[in-house]
Amino acid sequence: MKFQNKLNNEDYLNKYYRLNKIYKNDKVLKPFLKEISIISHDYTNELKLNNNKIHIISNTNDKYIYSTIVSINSILRNSNNNKTTIVYHILCPEDIRRRNINKLKSFLFIYPTNLEMIFYNMGNLFNRFKNNRFSQVAFYRLLSPIFIPVERVIYLDSDVLAFEDLETMYHLNFNNNYVLGFLDPLSYGVDYLGLKSEKYVNSGVLLINLDLIRKDKKYYEILYMLNNYKKFENNDQTIINYIFYPNIGILPSKYGIFNFNDIFDIKYIYLKSIRQNLNLTEIIEAFNHPALMHFIFCNPKVWFSNSLFIKKCTRIGTLGKASCIKYHYIWIENAKNTSFFKEIAKYYKIK
């Protein structure tokens, strides 16, 4: 098997540079485009060129490299190797360690027939903004329409695990929406932004309509909000919901369901916060049979050491703690399916 470092991949790079050419003379966008560059476009010579492609964005840095590895591995293990090629767009800060990029590239040898990886150096893209409360990495995908030359893309946080193939999700109808997301019952921004709770989505799992965002030039509004507003409780999530409202669609609940305690927990949280267009039956079915599960409800995060996790889990009551511990071990089992479990166990002090 021969490894290809395809900075000369004409098909993708031609599209990339054509898109870059459109925006390079734009006074607002030019400073951002100057920061972004492709590190490499990689695949093996065994890649099936005629497969359908699913484009996925992942933000990462040195701190979250292992959670990113586990998330990506779960996607690839559950993809349909015979029909689908996963094209991963990995958005990295300028200071990410080369050895961590190489760890991600090792997936090319494990899944040689159905994986491409494109690594982007995002430079110091968001240093210019006044709001430094949140990690810059979280904001990278907000500008993906100006440098990723495809029609649509899935975005996944690193605390998301897959249990099914994502081809059906990827080809969902946008119905003229900018994004499709998982209906978030913890809708922090609804009240003070005047949004409707039945349209407020979590930003950890998204299907993004890059073509429509480019057509309507919504990136200008994104940049304006980043530069002028400081009071977002949920940073990039609030921006996405505010800028794209009301053209926000709801994903089937199986794509992005949270790691709730149980069915009673689901009913309590959703009925308390969302009054319209609520399909509890679908949400409960998704909880029992998820395609993508977002591990949002564990504090500390599910990947921390067994003893720390059990001791410091902030879930209330015996049921809450037991639930969190259950999800902790689900994540560990997924980590064991990677080539880096020894490193992961050492890093997070997992026994």
Segments from the language model and where they lie:
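Short internal beta-strands
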Residues: I86-E94, G181-F182
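A glycosyltransferase accessory/donor-loop signature
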Residues: F3-T60, L210, K215-K351
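Histidine-anchored nucleotide/phosphate-binding helix
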Residues: I65-N81
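Hydrophobic targeting segments
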Residues: K53-S58, I75, V87-I90
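Short aromatic/hydrophobic "clamp" motif used to bind/position activated sugar donors
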Residues: V153
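The conserved acidic donor/metal-binding loop of glycosyltransferases
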Residues: D157-L161
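Conserved donor-nucleotide/metal-binding helix-loop-beta segment in metal-dependent transferases, i.e.
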Residues: A162-Y192
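Active-site-proximal specificity loops/subdomain of glycosyltransferases
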Residues: L108-I146
